[in-house]
Each structure stands twice: as structure tokens, then as C-alpha cells.
């Protein structure tokens, strides 16, 4: 069966699209870690949680938020969620401190990304599109932009506690998965910091929210994420005075079809 894409008049093969009807009562969860033991508070993350809750509701998802979970609680929350009824698709968002291949519970104990991915690859979720969104640092490297007019050399000296924390990490572990129908998006590149504005939230969620609100009606998820990546990468290029840091999100996909939202 073929239908027309309203955005450009192209024909879309319905067999190449995942079924994703809001009537199926799709579900999403948001894990929002802000206050940690021995780590800095993630001020501004509540702004992201509010944006995502609003966004998921508009996309037809029943969303539930969980704040300040320990490492064991993160795994148990994901386990219970993946074993419940989630409609045609599901979304899991985790916002926390992190490093390569892992993220942290508020108790400072790391959770391996591979363990979370394994929980999402269950028999009950076979052939259902699953989106895991990770909003966290993936290392302590800084993507510095080069600009010859007005670069602030002492920018990093103004946040000594933050960067001192980012240099003291648990051992990292790189993860991967070959399971189908799973897409994982990251707010930054492997090894790099993910930046967060204390009054507006993370760069990534700010742009992701705008992109999906503007384009979800006729654009599938992979293209929405690609546009989000572009906007985050170019976020401060229009600033003619100072450019200090840059950020490049990424995603990898094992989707076998296109995922459109029922909006």
C-alpha cells in the first residue's frame, strides 16, 4: 500500500513504516537524575523533563517521570517498564551524569549502557520500535570551537569544581548492540561533554523539542534526529563575539522501518 507524504508529495510504502497509532496507548518514561552523592547537581535538568513530558504528550505517549534514582533503581525501573504493556512503540529517556558506555545513579554507582539495552531487547518487544535517549556526558573531552575574535581563554577557569569532577571518573566501558528495532540517541559524541544551561536545560533537548514540534507531522524519527544534530552543532555559530564550546550529538539505529509519530 502506498500513501503520499504531505511534505514533498513523495509516495511512502506503508510496509516500510512501523505501526505507531496513539490509540494503542504508547508509553514513555523519563529518568531525571539531578541530586547526586559526591557529584555536582545537574541544575537545569528539570527544564528538560518538563519539555519532554509536554513533547511526549503531544506525540500521543503516556509518560511517567522518575527523579533521582540509584543505579539499581534505574535498572529495576527499566526492567518493569519493558515488561509492561507499551502500545505500538516505547521511549526511554535517561538524563544523568555519564561517561563512555555508562551513566550514573544518584548514589555515584555506574550503570552499563549495555545492561539497559539488554533489558529493552525482550521477546515481548520484538519488532516494536524502541527509542533510548541518553542525555549525559560521555567523557571529559571538550569540543572547543576555533574563533579568532574574542575567544575567552579563561572560560574553563571559571568552573574549576565542575571540570575537576569530570576528570575523576569510574572506569569506562564501550557498549554496542546488534538487536533490531532499537534506536539509541546521545546528546553528545563518545568521549565528550554534554552541555547544559542552568536556566534553559541542555542544548540537546532544547533543539530536539523544537525540531519535533516543527516537523513531526511528516518526518520520521531518524530524520528528526539528524536535523537535531545539525542544529546543536551549529547552535552558536551565529554568535559573532564569543564561541567557547561546541557539541555534536549522535545516534545509531537498528530500525528496519521508518518511525513516524501519530500527530
Swiss-Prot record:
One of its GO terms (biological process) is proteolysis. One of its GO terms (cellular component) is cytoplasm. Changing residue 8 to A: Loss of propeptide cleavage. SUPFAM superfamilies: Caspase-like. Coiled coil: none annotated. InterPro entries: Caspase-like_dom_sf, Caspase-related_regulators, Caspase_his_AS, Pept_C14_caspase, Pept_C14_p10, Pept_C14_p20, Pept_C14A. Disruption phenotype: Survival of touch neurons and several pharyngeal cells is not affected during development. In a ced-3 n2427 or ced-3 n2427 and cps-3 n4872 mutant background, no extra pharyngeal cells caused by impaired apoptosis are produced. In a csp-3 n4872, csp-1 n4967 and ced-3 n3692 mutant background, pharyngeal cells, that are normally fated to die, survive and 16 percent of animals have still 1 or more cell corpses that are morphologically apoptotic and are internalized by engulfing cells. In addition, apoptosis of the male linker cell occurs normally. Cleavage by csp-1 isoform b or ced-3 removes the propeptide and generates subunit p31 in vitro. An additional cleavage at Asp-149 generates the 2 subunits p17 and p14 but this cleavage appears to be less efficient. Residues 1-8 form a propeptide. Specifically expressed in the hermaphrodite germline. GO terms for molecular function: caspase binding; cysteine-type endopeptidase activator activity; cysteine-type endopeptidase activity; cysteine-type endopeptidase inhibitor activity involved in apoptotic process; zymogen binding. Keywords: Cytoplasm. Interacts with ced-3 (via large subunit p17 or small subunit p13); the interaction inhibits ced-3 autoactivation. Belongs to the peptidase C14A family. This is Putative inactive caspase B.
Amino acid at each position: 500500500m502506498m500513501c503520499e507524504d504531505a511534505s514533498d508529495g513523495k509516495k511512502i510504502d506503508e510496509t516500510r513504516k512501523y505501526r505507531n497509532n496513539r490509540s494503542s496507548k504508547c508509553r514513555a518514561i523519563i529518568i531525571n537524575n539531578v541530586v547526586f552523592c559526591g557529584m555536582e547537581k545537574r541544575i537545569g535538568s528539570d527544564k528538560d523533563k518538563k519539555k519532554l513530558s509536554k513533547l511526549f504528550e503531544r506525540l500521543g505517549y503516556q509518560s511517567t517521570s522518575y527523579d533521582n534514582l540509584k543505579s539499581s533503581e534505574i535498572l529495576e525501573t527499566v526492567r518493569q517498564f519493558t515488561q509492561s504493556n507499551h502500545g505500538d512503540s516505547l521511549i526511554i529517556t535517561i538524563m544523568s551524569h555519564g561517561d563512555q558506555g555508562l551513566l550514573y545513579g544518584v548514589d555515584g554507582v555506574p550503570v552499563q549502557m549495555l545492561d539497559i539495552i539488554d533489558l529493552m531487547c525482550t521477546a515481548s518487544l520484538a519488532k516494536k520500535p524502541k527509542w533510548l535517549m541518553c542525555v549525559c556526558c560521555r567523557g571529559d573531552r571538550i569540543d572547543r570551537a576555533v574563533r579568532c575574535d574574542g575567544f575567552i581563554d579563561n572560560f574553563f577557569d571559571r568552573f574549576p569544581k565542575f571540570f575537576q569532577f569530570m576528570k575523576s571518573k569510574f572506569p569506562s566501558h564501550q557498549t554496542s548492540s546488534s538487536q533490531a528495532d532499537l534506536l539509541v540517541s546521545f546528546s553528545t559524541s563518545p568521549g565528550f561533554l554534554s552541555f547544559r544551561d542552568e536556566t534553559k536545560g541542555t542544548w540537546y533537548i532544547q533543539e530536539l523539542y523544537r525540531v519535533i514540534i516543527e516537523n513531526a507531522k511528516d518526518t520520521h524519527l531518524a530524520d528528526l534526529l539528524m536535523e537535531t544534530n545539525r542544529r546543536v552543532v551549529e547552535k552558536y555559530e551565529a554568535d559573532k563575539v564569543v564561541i567557547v564550546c561546541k557539541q555534536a550529538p549522535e545516534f545509531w539505529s537498528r530500525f528496519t522501518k521508518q518511525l513516524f509519530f501519530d500527530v
